[in-house]
Amino acid sequence: MREFSQIRETTETKIKLSLQLDEGKNVSVQTGVGFFDHMLTLFARHGRFGLQVEAEGDVFVDAHHTVEDVGIVLGNCLKEALQNKEGINRYGSAYVPMDESLGFVAIDISGRSYIVFQGELTNPKLGDFDTELTEEFFRAVAHAANITLHARILYGSNTHHKIEALFKAFGRALREAVERNAHITGVNSTKGML
């Protein structure tokens, strides 16, 4: 089974995270940031991943360090769980509607970290979650995992729906990218490595 666990502790946060790419039944998320817990749960459910997250952070300041550090650890676990990347699709993309909103995510498990994030989030806060942290989370994942990630909110009016569409699209796109493909021998690159 492709899986990896990591504990990362700093003066600001303590993150314990386990990711299972091939087993999506066990999902448990506790970060101390309710909206973020909801989004991570949606990501795992729609990507059919197993995900267990326990996070303690300086949320008395704000949720920034917790959200960013969870993204770093998730990216690290993804990179390690993929091992040598042999036989995977490598690319994945998904459009996901959430009522009036439409989100799009495209992923390349390229070994090169890059992110493009486009979207207007008009409501600055949802519960104790600063909505600008959405981009920070995706940036942290992309850099830690060494993947190229494009995330775009095409349209919508409800900020919750916009972010939810992105997290669901992220799960579905990542599922497609990490899926093993019997038609691919070795790594899916003319270079012979990713």
Curated annotation (Swiss-Prot):
Record keywords: Amino-acid biosynthesis, Cytoplasm, Histidine biosynthesis, Lyase
InterPro entries linked = IGPD_sf, ImidazoleglycerolP_deHydtase, ImidazoleglycerP_deHydtase_CS, Ribosomal_Su5_D2-typ_SF
Which compartment or compartments is the protein found in?
A: Cytoplasm
The GO biological-process annotations, alphabetized, read as: L-histidine biosynthetic process
GO CC entries: cytoplasm
The UniProt entry, under Gene3D superfamilies, shows: Imidazole glycerol phosphate dehydratase, domain 1
Listed under catalytic activity are: D-erythro-1-(imidazol-4-yl)glycerol 3-phosphate = 3-(imidazol-4-yl)-2-oxopropyl phosphate + H2O
Bridged cysteine pairs (disulfide) = none
Q: Name one GO molecular function term.
A: imidazoleglycerol-phosphate dehydratase activity
Tell me which domain of life the UniProt entry assigns to the organism this sequence originates from. Answer: Bacteria
List the residue ranges forming a coiled coil, or say none.
none
The main enzyme category here is lyase
Q: Name one Pfam family in it.
A: IGPD
Q: What is its EC number?
A: 4.2.1.19
Pathway per the UniProt entry: Amino-acid biosynthesis; L-histidine biosynthesis; L-histidine from 5-phospho-alpha-D-ribose 1-diphosphate: step 6/9
Q: Which CDD domains match?
A: IGPD (cd07914)
Q: Which NCBIfam families match?
A: PRK00951.1-2, PRK00951.2-1, PRK00951.2-4
HAMAP family per the UniProt record, alphabetical: HisB
Family, per entry = Belongs to the imidazoleglycerol-phosphate dehydratase family.
Name of this chain's protein: Imidazoleglycerol-phosphate dehydratase
